[in-house]
Amino acid sequence: MILGIMGAMPDEVDQLCAKLENVTVEPYGGVEYHKGTLAGKQVVVCCAGMGKANAAATTQVLITKFGAEKIIFSGIAGNMTSKIGIGDVVIGKTVLYHDAQLDMICQNPPFLKEYSGDPELIAAAEAAC
């Protein structure tokens, strides 16, 4: 299994890239994809750039070009609350649109208001915390 790990800014992925073994860098679409092993697992690490359009495009490249079966987004996640501090971990069990009318979104494929996270990754993240 290949794991895709992405962040929005270089500071969010640079330390991961530095820990990769047997690393190769493959530029594609303006993004550098760092392929290698981390803790014995095959991973592809990249900096997607900020915003959901960049995240969506980079996620699709990780899946279709690099064969990533699971994706982890690592970073500051645009924290807008004082309840979450530096070093805290947020595990997203579901994600949804915040800037579109959900009734309109659900009229078109894939007809979903929200997307569930991968149960295996959620369990692993919870166990690590």
Give the label of every model feature segment.
Residues M1-F66:
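N-terminal short beta-loop-beta anion/metal-coordinating cradle
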Residues V13-D14, K52-A55, N79-K83, D99-A100:
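Short active-site-adjacent helix-start/loop capping segments
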